[in-house]
A protein has these predicted regions:
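N-terminal accessory targeting/assembly segments
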Residues: 12, 16-179
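Glycine-rich, often acidic-flanked micro-motifs
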Residues: 21-76, 84-85, 241, 249-267, ...
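A structural signal for short, well-ordered beta-strand segments and their strand-loop junctions
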Residues: 135-140, 263, 284-285
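Charged, amphipathic alpha-helical linker segments immediately N-terminal to NTP-binding catalytic cores
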Residues: 183-185, 189-239
Length: 343
């Protein structure tokens, strides 16, 4: 997943949410079971048009193109515009305040409370919104250390956002997927759902609500995929300290000979990814890690790097990764060649 901040945004066409195309009903292994719901009804999500679970990058890219969610670059990457939100929306994020978690949150103008009643009401609306729509489902893991990894289920309205989280999280093997069971945490992602601040208690038409008690995240009204990523980190940041693990916003790499690890701390855009992508060292991860008694491990299985001023000589790993199967946000393409303009 690649993104660029600060570019001008085109309006999202209405066709994005009401595509005239029918979902693809087959994959390379044969016909998809159009009746399988993978237990979504247990969380109240009923009557989906169809549920596509853990589809391949090629399939998700094809579906995103059919849905008019984006276009291809000259290297085959899927390029999308995220509309109004080209970054995270901190004013739109809330944590459900309940007695069981109240004393564990540093409440302030960033960690702001919302009631359980408001959360449940908005969740019911979003579940109704998903009815009679195709759902792009991803079941995966956060945490390379199997002793403290968490199972995340991400329910997506858009194929492109399913491609994002499929690339970012740790993907289960076929055997792990068959035995996946119930997730530890579920994230509902509906960019086309618009909140009503006066009724829903939100700051705007967008909202990111985290309920640690019911282990559910609601993301509405924003197509910026970084909200999914940071929601996963928020969950890991809340639960892992009680398991003796220090969550860290950092990149990390390792000397291939001595096995010594270097950690690079910094805010977004300060160079963590660039510093960790050293061709002479082994990359552990570029953004989110845990530090346990067993060592340092990556939460993720992919990379979400800024590509403004991206240079193939200075950052060859990132530059060469922008190809078929990857997702690029908010990068301008040459109209004739489809070559990205990173500058």
């Amino acid at each position: 997943m690649i993104k660029r901040d600060g570019c001008s945004q085109a309006a999202v066409e209405a066709a994005l949410w009401d595509s005239p195309y029918e979902p693809l009903a087959t994959n390379l292994k044969g016909v998809i079971d159009m009746q399988q719901t993978y237990g979504l009804e247990r969380m109240g999500l009923i009557n989906p048009q169809v549920v596509y679970r853990n589809m391949s990058p090629a399939w998700l890219t094809e579906q995103a193109l059919l849905n008019q969610e984006g276009v291809l670059s000259d290297t085959g990457a899927l390029v999308v515009r995220t509309g109004k939100y080209t970054g995270r929306a901190p004013d739109d994020k809330f944590i459900v305040d309940t007695p069981s978690i109240h004393d564990y949150i540093a409440w302030n103008n960033i960690n702001r409370p919302i009631s359980k009643e408001k959360f449940n009401a908005l969740k019911s609306k979003m579940l109704a919104y998903f009815q009679n729509r195709p759902i792009y489902l991803f079941d995966g893991f956060a945490g390379a250390d199997e002793q403290c990894r968490k199972k995340f289920r991400v329910v997506n309205e858009l194929a492109s956002e399913c491609l994002f989280i499929r690339n970012l999280l740790i993907r289960p093997t076929a055997e792990e997927l068959a035995q996946y069971g119930e997730p530890d945490f579920t994230i509902l992602v509906a960019p086309g759902f618009q909140c009503n601040p006066q009724v829903d208690g939100t700051h705007s038409q967008a909202a990111i609500l985290v309920d640690y008690e019911s282990r559910t995240v609601l993301i509405a009204g924003t197509r910026y995929a970084g909200e999914i990523k940071k929601s996963v980190f928020s969950v890991m940041n809340y639960f892992l300290p009680n398991e003796g693990v220090l969550p860290m916003h950092c990149s990390a790499n390792m000397d291939p000979v001595t096995k010594e690890t270097a950690i690079f701390f910094g805010l977004s855009g300060t160079g963590k990814t660039t510093l960790s992508a050293d061709p002479n060292r082994k990359l552990i991860g570029d953004d989110e890690h845990g530090w346990s008694s067993r060592g340092i491990f990556n939460f993720e299985g992919g990379c979400y790097a800024k590509c403004i001023n991206l240079n193939p000589e200075k950052e060859p790993y990132i530059y060469n990764a922008i190809k078929a199967g990857t997702l690029v946000e908010n990068v301008v393409l040459d109209e004739d060649t489809r070559h990205p303009n990173y500058f």
